[in-house]
């Protein structure tokens, strides 16, 4: 099976580029006839027929037989062969990993969530990361040589084109993607976590035809994914979307980026954690008092569970964070005039406790015409 054209970034070979576009069409739209493809791609029927035949020979496309029609000659319908290849996706969080495998049509084959893992910028943490992925691949009910690629979502500054990560695992001179490929013996692509989540929503989530989208990733940190005219926006070096580092506050809180006053210092999971400790020390009460007194680690999950149990302190902190986030998002909306803003990430699981103050602040601080143009949804 020819896999080189799928993983190549060379767009000079027209034949291979068109094959990739055909596969992308099937991923986005499902099964289709030769005529459908020709119409959508503005190609002649003979050209499409030739390309589809080559993809059939390579095992990527299947002929599903005649399509039912009301009359005339019945055309054959074609679609992706789910068993022609598999992909593994890895979601890297502060204290756990989520790993999934999908087939060539994008259907889930296997999912493992909340795998314990401590993210640190050390060779030992990187080795543990690779070991967990190795173990997952071995457990799959497919041949390992059928794994075409591994996608890794990484927080912070990532350049997918060069394969470099500048926020985590940057202790070697080689690109992180290359290091992972050598260790895992499979093609690896790295991507910023917020952008990856944005694309996931665009392909399989709450997006319903919108082409100009902002995805706000509210987790331990704060990130942003941007889609303009149906395409992910990267910026010059792949560093777009650092929403959490808007300078919005005159505080003395040092952000992990090394600067003070970042939005992330007052409106993120890490801010939630810090403010809870500060307020508790000042005398406020919380159902997390036992953990705070014992010095036990408090996770984002613990904070959200306290909110669900109607902990007054945690709800108050979250509401204030929502207002700050809403102000920032209102500014983004005034700049980008998006059709859709998606609220996602772990903090979005707080539901209306965070979404209502965000929406209220957006209405207050965004331009009315822009606000009326934009729909706000919670990620599913």
Segments and roles (model prediction):
Residues 107-108, 164, 231:
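Residue-level signal for well-ordered, solvent-exposed loop/turn and beta-edge residues enriched
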Residues 155-157, 220-221, 347:
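Short glycine-rich anion-binding loops that position phosphate/pyrophosphate groups of nucleotides
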Residues 101, 157-158, 226:
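Hydrophobic beta-strand positions
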Residues 111-113, 121-125, 181-309:
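Glycine/GP-enriched mid-protein hinge/lid loop-to-helix segment characteristic of carbohydrate kinases
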Residues 87-91, 147-151, 213-217, 223-225:
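Short glycine-aspartate micro-motif
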